[in-house]
Amino acid sequence: DLAVLRIGENVLFRGLGDCKFERANEAWKFDGGDGWTVAFSATWEQGRDWPTLAIGNFMDRETIIMDYGDCDASWLFRHNPGTGYQNPMALQPGHCTNSMLFSDWNRDGFADLRVSNDQEFYRRGSEQLFSLGPRGAVPMQAEDGWRTVNIWGMGIASNDITGDGYPDYYLTNMAANRFEVLAEGATGPSYEDRAGDFNI
């Protein structure tokens, strides 16, 4: 299957084999929206037969003047029997998203959603981590251990580079890229930039 992100309606295509696809928005009850979509991530959540999808939008197209505008909300789609991907949940606040990644950062068996944002365009924004639960997606705060980071966020990559059993994150940035490692002794999602220590 294939997800196509666009300025305008996003489209899901069902794979038919032999490099053939058919449009599936209507069959899967997926609202492709009309935003400026630049980011996508998908994961399998426990107890669900269909993948959970995150759609990341950049600026609200209706507010853009001279290349600047308000940051748009992004969306979390969970599939439910009978209703498909109807009734997506807003990921708010939106901070002009450029990249998303589902990741089980604390190895508890549940993926949360990291979001990398572009500080060139947001006001009072930052990088984000949304905790996923039955109520939707809740942004992590300082009281959860999440640290405020402001970058011209572009992309996110993840792997366990340090060998401690937890995923590390490489955040690309128009300035200095960040290599984020879970802080020693952290009980929440508290990360330190260790790019200098690893010469990257």
List each model region and its residues.
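Acidic, glycine/proline-rich Ca2+-coordinating loop motifs
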Residues: 1-200
